[in-house]
From Swiss-Prot:
Function: ADP-ribosylhydrolase that specifically reverses the SirTM-mediated mono-ADP-ribosylation at an asparatate residue of GcvH-L, by releasing ADP-ribose from the target protein. May play a role in the regulation of the response to host-induced oxidative stress.
Keyword check for Ribosomal protein: no
Recorded catalytic activity of this chain's protein: 4-O-(ADP-D-ribosyl)-L-aspartyl-[protein] + H2O = L-aspartyl-[protein] + ADP-D-ribose + H(+)
Name of the molecule in the record: Protein-ADP-ribose hydrolase
Cofactor, free-text remark: Binds 1 Zn(2+) ion per subunit.
Species assigned in the record: Streptococcus pyogenes serotype M6 (strain ATCC BAA-946 / MGAS10394)
Amino acid sequence: MPSSFDLLGEMIGLLQTEQLTSSLACPLPNALTKRQDLWRALINQRPALPLSKDYLNLEDAYLDDWRASFVPVSVKDCQKTNYTSLFLYHGDIRYLAVDAIVNAANSELLGCFIPNHGCIDNAIHTFAGSRLRLACQAIMTEQGRKEAIGQAKLTSAYHLPASYIIHTVGPRITKGRHVSPIRADLLARCYRSSLDLAVKAGLTSLAFCSISTGEFGFPKKEAAQIAIKTVLKWQAEHPESKTLTVIFNTFTSEDKALYDTYLQKENNCE
């Protein structure tokens, strides 16, 4: 079985031979981390076009190795809160072994094309594998228009421990600007649409990232309040959906502190 180092080298060679990306003349690095960065840059930039069976076999082997490098996190490993159906998980959402994780997507729904970008969309698409971009392309081709803010789409999670990914596009907020009622409602719609889709698909566990708080600039405090209030209100309006466990995933210490505070009933997100 080839090592991850060798698999990366072969994938890079195939991607460079395609000449579909801008990073064509880079020599093959000798360091593992440099190879990882170059492969990720190439696959991040690659258009949503079919891939060869040879490449997909290599990618499957490499991502299987990645998947075996950590212990997946289940609902029972997550932090309990004062609400029996709400949990917290602080860490990398890609490690969650739940029915579905929520991806903060953009209106193209094809993932992030910026090489090695730090957004959640990039991380999820990269390590789910390139079949995810192709699946999203099929959705967008059938839809025939950009994805509207506040809607939700379901795909397989491919190489991630989760079974599915729910993709939703949140609202953008210019830094320093007040959160208008319209944008607050658009963010709430992201949560409602994701919950509705999860129930429609028969899912029993759903993990939300902090939608719109990264590249889209939504203030973290307001976003956390909207997220929790919206989910609690949705649960109250859908008593038949008590089997759906919701996990709020936090990645920064600021987000964790906010959710820790607001998920105490006495605070009530005010």
